[in-house]
Amino acid sequence: MQDKKEMQDKMEEREALIDEVIEREWEQFQYVQNEGGRASCQDDHETFVIMRKSQFMNWTQELQESYRQEPIEAEAAHWNLLTEKYARMMESTAPERYAELADILPKRSKERIQMQEEMIAQQIRWEEDFAAKFPGVASTGRVIHTSEDTPWDTSIETYARGEISTYSDRTVGLLKKLYDQLAADHENLSEKTLRNMTALYGYESLEEAEKQQRARLER
């Protein structure tokens, strides 16, 4: 009975940690300046929470606690991590604008960039496998590859590169450890994230979401 209570307490503690991180991110997201004016997604709190929670639920507690410090440290330094993330994405989607911002972005070492690129390559493999297995659900999301980017459509690869580049070395090291463990166990992080997401949207399962989406596409 005690073990069950301790487990429940730990689950509630982790959920509270995730919620705290998401709300800090949401607060920073409100101050991101979009060149075309305020984006509609900046007013969609529910979707933001589901997207971020789906990702963070897969992280180890050590990784969650490491990343938890980053928006706090950024706020103390008057730095917006969400603005940095979208600025880094512009290296692919808006290179001229990115060139104007590049000098103010934190610099990353060659070793750090190499580690990031290894992780992104693994994520792309997961995304490609997921799209082959669940094409209906995959069709509702972003395109996969940076080569598919346009000024209006940012790929999963470019988004991942932008986000991972904002993390501290500490968090990147822990995330790399998670990626390596999942790959060794033949688990697909993209599929795990989408299972979380479809559950949070109220579907019985990812398979049920795929079935419904395929039916829509066939109409």
Region roles according to the model:
Residues D9-D43, S92-E96, E100-T150, T198-G202, ...:
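Polar/charged low-complexity regulatory segments
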Residues T154-N196:
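C-terminal structured interaction module
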Residues Q64, Q69-S109, Y179-A209, Q213:
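Repeat-associated, polar segments at repeat-unit boundaries in modular proteins
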